């Protein structure tokens, strides 16, 4: 006869096998196939089109922006064929003209849509711009390899599609190759407008622009950090929000700032040898990127970029001058470093497509020793986490897990948490949603403009 102890040992493997792996374990498994060699191949293919300038040929089958876009769409279609048609491609386009586009020009983005199985209207978007340039922003004929700027971001988009299309997610993932960035962020605006026209609930845009070199023009190297740029006070709706933010706070709690915190926390848990360096400004000093157009439309967005830039390789004619090599050449890229950044992107997309959207919390507590945090029920959420931190703290300090208090069939059911002896004056509060299988959304702060949806002023009383 078996002893109870031996019976317990016999049962233990089965019990352990029945327990589902944690979200972090699942995310590590999902991103494991990200390949530095595959990324190198994609960047090499993009460089092979000679130039990808927005004003270059759209009809030449081997050279120019048109050939590059066609190739990118072909890669999306190839990945879709491997997953039974799980990706649907589209080519949003518009006519543009401006300071760096002297005549009316057709501008096209290429996107692949991986529709969610439960919440197809909840969307996360990864972007990289496929266009390139040399020293003269108007030179559309010279070779402009654009290996790092932004072949690296475009390769990240394609690799994310290759890896994630092998899985299914409750929410939708959009993979987007954008045009016209170097001429005026046209591709970002085109896709943000397209998202609005489709009625998508955009949870996040992860814009990847210059993510493939680990050594700067001054010789400083850093392959263990990625910079994440995020706006502070929310830009969209800023006039209407200004007075409320002055009274209630929100300078450091835009949805994009919380998206940056989300990426920072995720990188720490992935254990891939990469740490997020949060940069608390919208973009590099005096410069811009396509994520800005998503922010202008009211969608949460951040820019990911290398820890140290090499200015000799950006926006430069390909040449050697006084022994210095100029030009955006594939030889200066660090593909193992690029692969780590792509793993972070891929994990973030998978996590946000698996979690419910963030709530839209509100806080009350003026002239009271207690604080009340309220929000409406989020479809798909099993639990919530209330977080708070001192007003001068950069990261959330206190967490309180809360079960959904509503009966099934009451989608508008309010949630309420009372925090006794926590004075609202001294803290910033936020709430995240958790799915039934444990995936947690980014935190939305209970401040004016903290909700992840585009800001809409309240109706007049």
What are these regions (language model features)?
Residues 112, 126-127, 131-132, 136-185, ...:
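Alpha-helical metal-binding/catalytic segments enriched in His/Glu/Asp
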Residues 178-289, 297, 301:
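Metal-dependent peptidase/peptidase-like ectodomains
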Residues 434-461:
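Extracellular fibronectin type III
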Residues 381-402:
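Extracellular low-complexity, O-glycosylation-prone stalks/linkers
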Residues 47, 211-230, 278-356:
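Active-site-adjacent mobile loop/cap segments within catalytic or ligand-binding domains
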Residues 369-381:
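Conserved aromatic anchor
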Residues 417-441:
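Beta-strand-rich modules
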Residues 30, 38-115:
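A non-catalytic alpha/beta surface segment that caps or lines the substrate-entry region
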